[in-house]
């Protein structure tokens, strides 16, 4: 009998002004990773939770609100942390409690991922210093100012540095998430 699949948990960090596609593109990639069982049923391989400074509604940059399931401090254990970008990052880089929460959240995760300008938030914390990373090309100059000691890779669609995987703008987050799915659950998924 085959061993049951390992169900992984993804924690999606939310903040005011996040970009909807930065969150829901990768979420769809993780949520679509499923395994067909011999009895015909389908087993999801990733569980998705949302986290923020405090649980409750978080308004995106495009307008729709997403509910944060947990405050960072109260989140259940997770394997992957996803940090989206968005115009809200311009204010969030100066939000010390959020940055401290992201440092702690990243330490809890086996893999920390960023989409678009989400890399600016982690760069601002210093946890990406000396590591290769990428980000949104339109906001490139602003992003690299947030972490001058990061080894920025401008041409990359995404950069996989083991426990840190960063992607460039918006839809590149889907490709990045699919690469993490393949790493954690195999190419056949």
Regions of interest found by a model, annotated:
Residues 107-111, 127-132, 163:
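Short active-site oxyanion
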Residues 1-112, 120-124, 141-144, 153-155, ...:
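Extended, subdomain-level signal for the structured scaffold at the beginning of enzyme domains
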Residues 64-66, 148, 167-168:
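Short, surface-exposed amphipathic charged segments that create phosphate/polyanion-binding patches used
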Residues 127-145:
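Short, glycine-/small-residue-rich phosphate/pyrophosphate-handling segment
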Residues 160-189:
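Conserved anion/nucleotide-ligand pocket segment
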Residues 149-150, 155-162:
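Crotonase-fold acyl-CoA enzyme core
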Residues 112-113, 134, 153, 165:
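Structural detector of well-ordered beta-strand residues that form the stable sheet scaffold
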């Amino acid at each position: 009998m085959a061993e049951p699949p390992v169900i992984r948990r993804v924690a999606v960090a939310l903040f005011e002004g996040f970009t909807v596609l930065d969150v829901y593109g990768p979420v769809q990639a993780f949520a679509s990773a499923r395994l067909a069982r011999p009895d015909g049923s389908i087993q999801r391989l990733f569980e998705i939770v949302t986290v923020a400074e405090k649980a409750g509604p978080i308004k995106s940059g495009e307008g729709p609100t997403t509910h944060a399931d947990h405050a960072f401090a109260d989140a259940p254990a997770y394997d992957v942390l996803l940090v989206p970008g968005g115009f809200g990052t311009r204010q969030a880089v100066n939000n010390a409690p959020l940055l401290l929460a992201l440092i702690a959240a990243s330490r809890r995760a086996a893999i920390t991922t960023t989409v678009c300008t989400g890399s600016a938030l982690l760069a601002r914390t210093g946890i990406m210093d000396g590591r290769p990373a990428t980000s949104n090309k339109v906001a490139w100059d602003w992003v690299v100012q947030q972490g001058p000691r990061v080894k920025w890779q401008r041409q990359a669609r995404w950069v996989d540095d083991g426990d840190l995987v960063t992607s460039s703008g918006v839809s590149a987050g889907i490709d990045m998430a699919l690469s993490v799915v393949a790493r954690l659950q195999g190419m056949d998924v």
